[in-house]
Amino acid sequence: MPLQAPDIRSAKRLVVKIGSALLVDGEGLRRQWLSALALDVAEARTRGTQVILVSSGSIALGRRVLHLPPGPLALEQSQAAAAVGQIRLARAYEEVLAPHGITTAQVLVTLEDTEDRRRYLNSRATMETLLGLGTVPIVNENDTVATDEIRFGDNDRLAAQIAVTVGADQLVLLSDVDGFYSANPKEDPTAERFDLVETITPALEAMAGDPVSGLSKGGMKTKIMAAKTAVAGGCAMAITEGSAMRPLKALEQGAARTWFVAQGDPQAARKRWINAMKPRGTIRVDAGAVQALQAGKSLLPAGVVAVEGNFGRGDPVEIAGPMGEVLGRGLTRYTAVEAVQIAGHRSAEIVAILGYSGRAALIHRDDMVI
């Protein structure tokens, strides 16, 4: 049986990346297009799909407000434009989604927030909470403080990192190109679009040209890098041309696109990632905690009897039973020093012991392999 392309209607958690050229044109913000996208988001949510939007456009929007000249901007100018544009971008999303009863939340991140384990855990916890509360997070690269990210325009990779961080099963890159081609279709009339990519091979990567529009900075190479990150994390990814009204509806109805097939599901990919890490310490638990962990529960401080090693928040640790038998691995939400202090205590006592409020679980079940 031939491999089937993913169906956007079946997505449980969908990340949509919106390129600058789609949001902003010579006249400013494309509000009518954004309102049409809001219809797509509202429709997806009625199907039970959780939606996260990763949006470019703050610099492109801000530079018009500040009347900056066309062409490349100095780093400081880009950061200033981002500071002005982020406010207007967040307001625009709020205005088009609010009529559908959708609450938006602005989340500003950089690639470092997903690559550093401690910050990764914090970002993940925040996003999970926002989704659980029924919001649509609007994620934007924090171009006001970022440096390399501004120079290289990496929101494609950022979107893939966000998709993996939140365990999304589908990522859609709305772009100014309608898929991945064997060559640059603007230069080679014989270039063919791939409808479905099962494996990203070196030969396929070599086909990636570097088409760059006047407003967006991400070329096809960054999209292939994003696809590699996404599919390895169990998330299917599509590249599609998004300028049409209701671009997600168009994708659903068979618009031109390239789908990159996921390697397994997001949770399994995450478990493999955690299991491959080298432990920085060991947390030994009592018999009651063993039963709770085997039943799929999180590890609470009350079940901890000993802490070994020197580890920080977000570091991988080994989880051992009363006799030292290895039960699994997980990412700890506390440092070794903090874990020693709260070991054996109820979660409600954490504030009194540490002097500040922390997570209820020492290791959350989603950050654990047993």
From Swiss-Prot:
A GO biological process held by the record: L-proline biosynthetic process
PROSITE patterns, per the entry: GLUTAMATE_5_KINASE (PS00902), PUA (PS50890)
Major subcellular location class: cytoplasm
One GO CC annotation: cytosol
Entry EC no(s): 2.7.2.11
Reaction equation(s) it catalyzes: L-glutamate + ATP = L-glutamyl 5-phosphate + ADP
Biological pathway: Amino-acid biosynthesis; L-proline biosynthesis; L-glutamate 5-semialdehyde from L-glutamate: step 1/2
TM region positions: none
UniProt key word Cytoplasm: yes
Keyword Cytoplasm: yes
Domain PUA: 280-357
Subcellular location: Cytoplasm
Family: Belongs to the glutamate 5-kinase family.
Name the UniProt record assigns to this protein: Glutamate 5-kinase
Species this chain originates from: Cereibacter sphaeroides (strain ATCC 17023 / DSM 158 / JCM 6121 / CCUG 31486 / LMG 2827 / NBRC 12203 / NCIMB 8253 / ATH 2.4.1.)
Taxonomic classification: Bacteria, Pseudomonadati, Pseudomonadota, Alphaproteobacteria, Rhodobacterales
